[in-house]
Design a protein with these regions (language model features):
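Membrane-integrated ABC transporters
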Residues: 1-51, 60-80, 94-98, 124-182, ...
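Transmembrane-helix motif of ABC transporter permease domains
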Residues: 29-54, 67-107, 147-148, 204-233, ...
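A hydrophobic transmembrane-helix motif
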Residues: 39-42, 46, 176-205, 211-232, ...
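Cytosolic ends of transmembrane helices, especially the final helix of ABC transmembrane type-1 domains
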Residues: 232-236, 247, 264-268, 274, ...
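Loop segments that connect adjacent transmembrane helices in multi-pass transporters
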Residues: 234-291
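Conserved beta-strand
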Residues: 398-403, 408-425, 449-451
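ABC-family ATPase nucleotide-binding domain "signature/switch" substructure
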Residues: 441, 476, 509-603
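Conserved "ABC signature" C-loop
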Residues: 466-512
Length: 603
């Protein structure tokens, strides 16, 4: 890779960091954020100033020791006491304010990304888009995926872990870099003045190098930085891959817990153990590569650091033994060299953190870019919702409705449908014909759709797999509204009407209801939610498929009565003949012949 390409890559990374950081410092919290940042910068400058004072103290103190001057010795101990106290206060508040900025930034950024993830159905669209990306990602030379190639996986990791790493490392590394620059500028002049000149003869000519110790520090750190980058460069891609494999392993563990009953009934423990072991072996394999590279990096950085302890003494020793400098100046040279070398070695000392920072920034950048794409107004379905709530004019209509699969195949083309109040309609068709996809398009969440849809205002959807949050039963029943909106009598009546009288006494019991209840109980709980909220329109997708016929008929009778009282209608997807009795109209998705054009037509 050429130097210009490397430079372009560094600038691209810095632009990514700037793009991710700027929104917080321009947000509603901007003055607090900027104030904290300014205070941290001021404390860093104060810390460097105190180090300069301590460096000067070194010269006076050690000269007093060499000269056996007790008066100066005790005076300098007193001076050191207040220098140390001021430095400690600065260090404590620098740590506190840095942590405060990190946690405030993390809180804001997490909430911002979480809001964008849950807005405009972005979380749903991103999950759908995961299944249509390329099978493999091409990677950069550092082992990172090319940006924008496919939707990032594991959004939970991005929100919970990556935001925390990014904010802490951005603050920590940027302030560390600032501290290194200021330290270098403050001590390079001191070291230049103390180091004197180095004279030598070559080819009959005499040469003098002023500020010899400064040039030795630059040479020492340049060699160290180049070798560190050469040794540690693979850590960038390995860190990225480690986080991905850890998240995949964690995700599969959660799935085993969620589907524990089904796995136990299928006797699938051996298969799941093998799958988990395979994923964990992948985690370990990458981790072994990671620690192998870290071992090399740690070995070199420790060698580099230990050599730096004696290096200034070796270089300055001839001047000390010749009497050109005193012990105090030698110690001041050592201290100044240590500060200059430490500043110039910032890259060496932080290489592992820089690799992790870059990998985290790449992951968050891809996640943020995916959110931006998903939160843009979709170019497909235009969904208009009426302002009315009930009445004879309240209808469900769709015109010019075209549905596509993620693969690009067309399910329906230019379909039109209309349902008036009281026209209970049953949608049927073979499995995989797009019945649920049509419901998703009517709800406005299917991204591969075109057309105009008008929904009544007071409508509820019952999906095949209803969602119930962990927590109290009353919260699960009232979701997404607050349970306080409904009285205990209303909640209990809804449960009894949905044939769940046994749950009426458990409203305040907290549990994972999706795992606690059977499939039939979950379907009845979803219907109880509808009976509680009393919408005028109900669109049900296989809402009673796990129930026996008598229970199914009883619940459909109640749903039908509910919608008729409110001046609406039911639209259902179902296969059983018993459900057909509750619907006056029938829609059917029929397969069309041929490979070209839409796969189905709606009749």
């Amino acid at each position: 890779m050429s130097w210009s390409e490397k430079t372009a890559r560094v600038w691209r990374f810095l632009r990514q960091v700037w793009h991710l950081s700027l929104p917080y410092f321009n947000s509603a919290e901007k003055w607090k954020a900027r104030g904290l940042l300014a205070a941290i910068v001021a404390l860093n400058l104060g810390a460097v100033y105190m180090l300069v004072q301590i460096n000067e103290w070194n010269r006076v103190f050690y000269d007093a020791l060499q000269q056996k001057n007790a008066t100066v010795f005790w005076a300098q101990l007193g001076r050191f006491t207040w220098l140390a106290m001021i430095f400690i206060v600065i260090a404590v508040y620098r740590f506190y304010l840095t942590q405060l900025l990190q946690v405030r930034w993390r809180a804001w950024m997490t909430r911002d990304l979480m809001h964008r993830w849950l807005t405009h159905d972005a979380f749903y669209r991103m999950e759908l888009a995961r299944y249509i990306g390329p099978a493999e990602e091409s990677t950069t030379e550092a082992g990172l995926p090319q940006p924008g190639q496919r939707v990032p996986d594991n959004p939970d990791q991005r929100l919970q872990e990556d935001v925390n790493i990014f904010t802490s490392q951005t603050v920590g590394l940027s302030m560390g870099f600032l501290n290194a620059v200021v330290t270098l500028l403050s001590f390079v002049g001191i070291l230049w003045g103390l180091s004197g000149s180095f004279s030598f003869s070559l080819g009959g000519s005499s040469f003098t190098i002023p500020g010899f110790m400064v040039w030795m520090a630059v040479l020492y750190c340049t060699v160290g930085s180049v070798l560190t980058h050469y040794i540690g460069r693979p850590l960038i891609g390995l860190n990225f891959e480690q986080q991905r494999r850890e998240a995949n392993f964690r995700h599969h563990l959660v799935r085993v817990r969620e589907y524990s009953e089904a796995i136990a009934l299928d006797k699938g423990q051996t298969v799941e153990e093998h799958n988990l072991d395979t994923r964990f072996a992948s985690v370990l394999a990458n981790y072994l590569q990671l620690i192998g590279k870290q071992k090399q990096l740690v070995g070199f950085t420790n060698l580099f650091g230990q050599a730096a302890v004696v290096f200034p003494f070796i270089v300055a020793a001839p001047r000390f033994f010749s009497g050109a400098i005193q012990l105090g100046e030698l110690m001041q040279i050592s201290s100044a060299f240590d500060r200059v070398q430490g500043a110039l070695s910032w890259f060496v000392d932080n290489y592992d953190s820089l690799a992790s920072w870059r990998a985290t920034t790449e992951r968050l950048t891809s996640f943020e870019a995916a959110l931006s794409r998903q939160n843009q107004a979709p170019a497909g379905l235009e969904r208009a919702q009426t302002a009315t709530t009930s009445g004879a004019s309240d209808t469900l209509t769709a015109n010019g409705l075209t549905l596509q699969l993620p693969t690009g195949a067309t399910l329906l083309e230019d379909a039109a449908l209309s349902v008036a109040p009281g026209e209970h309609t049953l949608l049927q068709g073979p499995s995989g014909s797009g019945k649920s996809t049509l419901f998703r398009a009517l709800a406005g969440i299917w991204p591969w759709a075109k057309g105009d849809v008008a929904l009544p205002a007071n409508v509820m959807f019952i999906p095949q797999r209803p969602y119930f949050p962990d927590g109290s039963l009353r919260d699960a029943l009232a979701y997404p509204e607050p349970a306080s909106r409904y009285s205990d009598a209303e909640l209990k009546q809804a449960l009894e009407d949905a044939l769940l009288p046994g749950l009426a006494a458990r409203l305040d019991e907290r549990d994972n209801w999706t795992q606690k209840l059977s499939g039939g109980e979950l379907q009845r709980l979803a219907i109880a939610r509808v009976l509680l909220k009393q919408p005028a329109w109900v669109l049900a997708d296989e809402a009673t498929s796990a129930l026996d016929v008598p229970a199914e008929e009883a619940l459909y009778q109640r749903l039908k009565a509910l919608t008729e009282r409110a001046g609406g209608a039911m639209v259902s997807i179902a296969h059983r003949p018993s459900v057909a009795a509750f619907h006056q109209r029938h829609w059917r998705l029929k397969r069309l012949p041929g490979e070209q054009g839409p796969l189905y037509t709606l009749t």
